[in-house]
């Protein structure tokens, strides 16, 4: 496995700048998740690293080697797309074996069998090994595509929302499996997702992309607790961070335009009165929807709370984040 370095990478599509001077180091053995809304440049970043597309400016290094001019095969990267890409006329087993049968690798038969079996078990498709790829459900095909990447030992795995087409239970299972495969093998993984839970649970680092610019890079915890802007703060956390006018509570510093309060950073029982508008019991926690001076706030409370819609609850900020008129964090 290898470190991947992007140095001032820029990519334009006619006059649209999809990646704008992006510099980023994906450390060897890390699990980096790229975050950003649609169009932020996540897929473009993966395509540049894979060699499917060329940057207009800047350099990409994998394992210290410059990648300019090298084909995807020469880069030895494994990519999993959101949409499965299988050989339809081959069986699941043949699809999984395919990458190992490359003449360059000359993997021994016993080794191929062992790897295919192990991966098929992890991905819960062992019972479908002899089926034709076309005889699978969408979720099964996607698992085979993931398997085709995992049987290899590339320099880096590039995955673009690989779990988004799977049902919730399988997604939760595979999240744990992928993370343990990565942690166990020391693989380097660059991963795109819109799923907050995937990002928080799997990433060693997250990179926040905003209109083609990398605006923050750090551990999920760092980005969660110390976001550089409202934009970065809104990328992690569910329910989302509450953004309110800064003067809605006393104590805002000069130049503060907005206060950001994570749902769990609102103390209840003292402070200002707010109205409970909805109580959502989710089992392990309860969400309170509050109306406070014409603003809606979401906070969390005790799972067995007796609060009901129409009640009054006192609230005050705990660990507030302040942002200026441009949405940038104030120290
Ligand atoms: N082949 C292309 N031709 C023209 N424009 C493109 C092309 N590929 C991407 N773009 C543009 O570049 C920008 C970044 O696209 P990209 O696919 O990287 O976004 P993304 O963050 O992956 O979004 P999504 O979450 O929707 O996949 C977008 O504005 C997109 O329209």
Where does each model-flagged region fall?
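The feature captures the beta-strand-to-loop junction immediately N-terminal to the Walker
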Residues: 35-37
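Helix-to-loop junction immediately C-terminal to a conserved catalytic motif
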Residues: 50
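Conserved coupling/switch loops of ABC nucleotide-binding domains, chiefly the family-specific signature
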Residues: 56-59, 211, 320
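Conserved ABC transporter NBD signature motif
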Residues: 58-66
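ABC ATPase nucleotide-binding domains
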Residues: 72-78, 82-228
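Non-catalytic connector elements of ABC transporters
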Residues: 251-331
């Amino acid at each position: 496995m290898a470190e991947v370095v992007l140095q001032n990478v820029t990519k334009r599509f006619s006059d649209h700048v999809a990646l704008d001077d992006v510099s980023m180091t994906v450390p060897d053995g890390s699990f980096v998740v790229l975050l950003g809304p649609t169009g932020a440049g996540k897929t473009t970043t993966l395509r540049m690293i894979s060699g499917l597309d060329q940057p207009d400016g800047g350099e990409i290094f994998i394992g210290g080697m410059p990648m300019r001019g090298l084909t995807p095969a020469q880069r030895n990267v494994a990519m999993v797309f959101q949409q499965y890409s299988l050989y339809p006329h081959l069986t699941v087993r043949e699809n999984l074996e395919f990458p190992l049968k490359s003449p360059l690798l000359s993997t021994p038969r016993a080794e191929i069998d062992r790897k295919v079996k192990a991966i098929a078990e992890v991905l819960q498709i062992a019972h479908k090994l002899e089926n034709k790829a076309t005889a699978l459900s969408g979720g099964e095909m996607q698992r085979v595509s993931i398997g085709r990447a995992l049987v290899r030992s590339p320099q880096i795995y590039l995955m673009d929302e690989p779990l988004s087409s799977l049902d919730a239970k399988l997604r939760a299972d595979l999240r744990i499996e992928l993370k343990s495969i990565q942690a166990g093998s020391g693989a380097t993984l660059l991963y795109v997702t819109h799923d907050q839970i995937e990002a928080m649970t799997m990433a060693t680092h997250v990179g926040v992309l905003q209109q083609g610019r990398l605006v923050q890079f750090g551990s999920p915890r760092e980005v969660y607790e110390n976001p550089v802007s409202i934009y970065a703060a809104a990328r992690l956390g569910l329910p989302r961070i509450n953004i309110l006018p800064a003067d809605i509570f006393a104590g805002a510093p000069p130049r503060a335009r907005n206060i950001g309060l994570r749902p769990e950073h609102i103390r209840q029982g003292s402070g200002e009165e707010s109205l409970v508008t909805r109580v959502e019991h989710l089992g392990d926690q309860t969400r309170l929807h509050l109306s406070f001076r014409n603003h809606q706030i979401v906070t969390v409370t005790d799972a067995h709370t007796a609060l009901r819609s129409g009640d009054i609850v006192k609230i005050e900020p705990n660990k507030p984040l302040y942002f200026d008129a441009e949405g940038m964090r104030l120290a």
